[in-house]
Amino acid sequence: TVQPVVPGEGADITGADFLFMGAGTERAQRFAAEDFARYSATVKAAAEDGTAMLFAGTAMELLGASVTDRDGDTYPGIGLASFTTVQGKRRIVGDVYGVTALFPEAVVGFMNKCGQIRGVEAPLLTGLSLGFGTGRTCSPLSSPGQFW
């Protein structure tokens, strides 16, 4: 059974088999953060129990300690992890193709964001042959290294 969670209405997500939160604009993210905070303890408990989760784009940023918007205002994430996000004025849009220690095959994705993730000690993507890595200002084709 799929249970939609409507902002402002609340829902009991305890015991969910799968949690999904889709991406939105940076402006919508701030409003979502206020509502999402009520689920902090439940999401953390679900993560500890091994519940499968998919948080895309700006939704994933809410799992960290905080988000600082392009104007310099900071608001809290739920603190599932200690990373922070700092949003800039430049939007990076494009395909991503890279490798990770999580899977034997390459991974393919799409990026549409203006936030840089900071404080991730073990990068998820260890090689990138197409696209931009988080926190980088240049293409990996001219600057090889670790990404995201």
Where do the protein language model's features map onto the residues?
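Amide-donor transfer/coupling interface in amidating biosynthetic enzymes
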Residues: 87-148
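Residues at the C-termini of beta-strands that transition into short coil/loop
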Residues: 6-8, 82-84, 113
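Cysteine-nucleophile active-site neighborhood
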Residues: 24-104
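Flexible, charged surface loops at secondary-structure boundaries
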Residues: 11-15, 47-48, 142-143
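A generic local structural motif
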Residues: 4-8, 39-42, 98, 135-137
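Extended, subdomain-level signal for the structured scaffold at the beginning of enzyme domains
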Residues: 1-33
